[in-house]
């Protein structure tokens, strides 16, 4: 396989991941926030056994296995439930944007905990990403304090889970980089996520799961998307141009919002797109800070 082809396959993973906000929200409307997420990750985990493979548990570094599984499961649960508990389709897309603070936070964590060199660009990068999220939450008025507070109070749990999830994923990336030693535990982690969600589903009161044709289509699409995205990303990381893939991944907030708007039939305002571009720009500045550090 040529390097260009592998890079293209890796970039396809970014496109696939960008559909997850819309698909997870669509599935949760029929199967419930918890039941829908449990079904998605269970099916995805089974698919990953065939696309990525099941690792030999004993060979995986214990630190990575324990910390990685805890952080990965926690993050995926935060993400899925933040989207499922959102009050409206538009709010689900906003919640997804809050979660996209993770690229900037990942670089910050790499600087703080992994000794990543950096320069002054990291400060405006982090600030721009944070302002971008606030701009999105301000609705049509942009950076408007009262609108931001009013928006958050309509569904505080969703925004809280998305915000905490961004920090958890940044921590997961830091742990993986430091302790994985080339091992990939993604199949185990996704299966653990599904199992954890099923335990939560059966131990707590949950809405009835309503299986309709549209919901089943979205469920299968979400499971296959997640399964093939991780497989495609692995190909890109192993054989492609990692720099191009890294830059491409920082435009995920815009692509994800656009695809979610189509999947959920939720048109977005010009102010939203301004905020989304700020989040992307902030992430790119953080990345450039490490390249020139």
Curated annotation (Swiss-Prot):
Periplasmic domain ranges by topology: 28-33, 84-92, 140-155, 204-218, 265-267
Location of the protein in the cell: Cell inner membrane
Record's bilayer topology term: Multi-pass membrane protein
Segments in the Cytoplasmic topological domain: 1-6, 55-62, 114-118, 177-182, 240-243, 289-293
Residue stretches spanning the membrane: 7-27, 34-54, 63-83, 93-113, 119-139, 156-176, 183-203, 219-239, 244-264, 268-288
GO molecular function, one term: amino acid transmembrane transporter activity
Gene Ontology BP annotations: amino acid export across plasma membrane
A GO CC term attached to the entry: plasma membrane
Keywords noted in UniProt: Amino-acid transport, Cell inner membrane, Cell membrane, Membrane, Repeat, Transmembrane, Transmembrane helix, Transport
Top-level taxonomic group: Bacteria
Positions of the EamA domain: 6-137, 158-285
UniProt main location, coarse: membrane
Reaction catalysis annotation: L-phenylalanine(in) = L-phenylalanine(out); L-tyrosine(in) = L-tyrosine(out); L-tryptophan(in) = L-tryptophan(out); L-threonine(in) = L-threonine(out)
Record-stated family: Belongs to the drug/metabolite transporter (DMT) superfamily. Aromatic amino acid/paraquat exporter (ArAA/P-E) (TC 2.A.7.17) family.
NCBIfam families tied to this protein: PRK11689.1
Role: Amino acid transporter with broad substrate specificity. Can transport various amino acids, including phenylalanine, tyrosine, tryptophan, L-threonine, L-methionine, L-lysine, L-glutamate, L-valine and L-isoleucine. Overexpression confers resistance to phenylalanine and increases export of phenylalanine, tyrosine and tryptophan.
Protein name from the UniProt record: Aromatic amino acid exporter YddG
Gene name of the encoded protein: yddG
């Amino acid at each position: 396989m040529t390097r260009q082809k592998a890079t293209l396959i890796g970039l396809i993973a970014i496109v696939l991941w960008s559909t997850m906000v819309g698909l997870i929200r669509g599935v949760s409307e029929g199967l419930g926030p918890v039941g829908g997420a449990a079904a998605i990750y269970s099916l995805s985990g089974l698919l990953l056994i065939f696309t990525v493979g099941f690792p030999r548990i004993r060979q995986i570094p214990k630190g990575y296995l324990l910390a990685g599984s805890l952080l990965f499961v926690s993050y995926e649960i935060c993400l899925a439930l933040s989207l499922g508990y959102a009050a409206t389709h538009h709010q689900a897309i906003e919640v997804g944007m809050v979660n996209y603070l993770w690229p900037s936070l990942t670089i910050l964590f790499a600087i703080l905990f992994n000794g990543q060199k950096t320069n002054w660009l990291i400060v405006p990068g982090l600030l721009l990403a944070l302002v971008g999220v606030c701009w999105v939450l301000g609705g049509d008025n942009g950076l408007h304090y009262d609108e931001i507070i009013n928006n958050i109070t309509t569904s505080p749990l969703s925004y809280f889970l998305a915000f905490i999830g961004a920090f958890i994923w940044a921590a997961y990336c830091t742990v993986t980089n430091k302790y994985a030693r080339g091992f990939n535990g993604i199949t185990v982690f996704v299966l653990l996520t599904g199992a954890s969600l099923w335990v939560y589903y059966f131990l707590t009161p949950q809405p009835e799961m309503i299986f309709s044709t549209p919901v089943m289509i979205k469920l299968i699409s979400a499971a296959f998307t997640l399964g093939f995205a991780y497989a495609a990303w692995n190909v890109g990381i192993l054989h492609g141009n990692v720099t191009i893939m890294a830059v491409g991944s920082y435009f995920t907030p815009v692509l994800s919002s656009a695809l979610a708007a189509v999947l959920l039939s939720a048109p977005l305002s010009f102010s939203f797109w301004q905020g989304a571009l700020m989040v992307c720009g902030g992430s790119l500045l953080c990345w450039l800070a490490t390249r020139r550090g």
